[in-house]
Amino acid sequence: MVLIAYCVNVILHMIIAELSYNNGGVQLVKSFEGELFHGKMKQIFSWSVFIVYGLAIMIGVSGNINGGAQIFVNWFGMPFVAAQVLYYVIAGVVVFIGMKAVGIAQKYAVIVLMGIVAVMTVGTFLHPLNSLQRAEFHWNNLLALYSMVVFATSANQAVIQVVKGLDGNAKQIRRSIFIGFGLSSVFVLIVTGTVLLGTKGALEKELAYMQLGESIGTWAMILAGVFSLFALLTTFSVSYTHLRAHETVLDL
């Protein structure tokens, strides 16, 4: 199922990359303007897509804030509302440092995340492992796994940035998409596998990686929290920068 999700994601993001490539590396809404929207209704359709896209990002960001707040609750035992405010203040720094600095920070954040996953994986296998139980086959479980993998590895706006960053080099764009989604899928398998193998007791927390950390030791719980925090902050900053980019191209 992970392989199917990988193939579907690659095909969909190849289409997005081609749309952006054919329209000079512009954002998604502008690509729709160049390929789909014409005539008197062009602006109405463009604004409609932007509004829907913006709402989707805002809903995602709200969930992101709740996830980030949960980390502070686990770390400091603070009230959830206060944790939400604290996370929002930290994440809001992106507004002040600018999109270029955000891009540079994301590069190093990804390196940190890869290092944490490597350490957590080693730590998992240094402790007694759970036996993987085989659940009864059901289509709903299969579809849930597919949806999770597709959601976790989706990167439609990152593909557009690849088109711009590689100056329209089609060969390198294709290679980046294949390799990028391959790495993302491997990460999903590693993180999911270590959580299932190393977590003691039933999975009860929303942030399963932190529960894995608790099962390994205090140091691992801290690392898992840092991993979750960095991952959520990266997602938050990406959501903001891409929404801001769409505002710019629409002259808002």
Write out the residue ranges for each language-model feature:
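Single conserved hydrophobic/aromatic residue that forms the stacking wall/gate
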Residues: 242-245, 249-252
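Hydrophobic alpha-helical transmembrane segments of multi-pass membrane proteins
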Residues: 3, 48-59, 89-90, 143-150, ...
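Oxyanion-binding "anion nests"
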Residues: 206-244
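Membrane-water interface regions at transmembrane-helix termini and the short interhelical loops
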Residues: 67-74, 88-109, 165
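Central hydrophobic cores of alpha-helical transmembrane segments in multi-pass inner-membrane proteins
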Residues: 6-15, 91-96
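Hydrophobic core segments of alpha-helical transmembrane domains in multi-pass membrane transport
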Residues: 90-95, 114-121, 228
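Transmembrane-helix boundary/entry motifs in multi-pass membrane transporters
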Residues: 15-59, 73-80, 209-225
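Helix-loop-helix junctions that connect adjacent transmembrane segments
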Residues: 81-86, 104-211
